[in-house]
């Protein structure tokens, strides 16, 4: 299965992606991990990404798209993948659609993990990260809302919404149900 996971910071995407990847036998592809791996291994794309990150700039979509395209072409992703943290914009969603279409593939599902802002604030403040001040958290949630609302509309046909409040196992069961598993 080829799945995209959407949801605000603190919704549990990474945790659920790992569980789904294990259950479905496909790789969990996180753009954060892709950047780290390519930078650590000093690949051509990693060296280029590092220049932007070191300057405190956003990595351009074209570079992120290239990293994702390279990753989905690897053998372990031939039967599917779970994307976490990508796409983040309609532009990236269209690029992903083009990548898949060029391989005669398409997405099987897009899952949105939905959590109230109060619950997210509570979760993120409870993580104890230095950069998780209420102001920073609220800004990250606003950025997510502003960027993601158009994505939810873009993926309307494939979109499955999952209530992400509850135990890890409860949310996992809902995600599997959304996938018809």
Swiss-Prot record:
Translocase found in the keyword field: no
Cellular localization per UniProt: Cytoplasm
Ranges for region LID: 126-132
Binding site for ATP: 10-15, 127, 166
Residue pairs linked by disulfide bridges in the UniProt entry: none
Spans annotated as NMP: 30-59
EC number: 2.7.4.3
UniProt keyword list: ATP-binding, Cytoplasm, Kinase, Nucleotide biosynthesis, Nucleotide-binding, Transferase
Catalytic activity: AMP + ATP = 2 ADP
A GO MF term: ATP binding
Residues annotated to bind AMP: 31, 36, 57-59, 85-88, 92, 129, 140
Pathway assigned to this chain's UniProt record: Purine metabolism; AMP biosynthesis via salvage pathway; AMP from ADP: step 1/1
GO BP terms in the entry: AMP salvage
Superkingdom of this protein's organism: Bacteria
This protein's record includes keyword Transferase: yes
GO cellular component terms listed in the entry, alphabetical order: cytoplasm
Function: Catalyzes the reversible transfer of the terminal phosphate group between ATP and AMP. Plays an important role in cellular energy homeostasis and in adenine nucleotide metabolism.
UniProt similarity note: Belongs to the adenylate kinase family.
Domain writeup: Consists of three domains, a large central CORE domain and two small peripheral domains, NMPbind and LID, which undergo movements during catalysis. The LID domain closes over the site of phosphoryl transfer upon ATP binding. Assembling and dissambling the active center during each catalytic cycle provides an effective means to prevent ATP hydrolysis.
Oligomer and partners: Monomer.
Listed name of the protein: Adenylate kinase
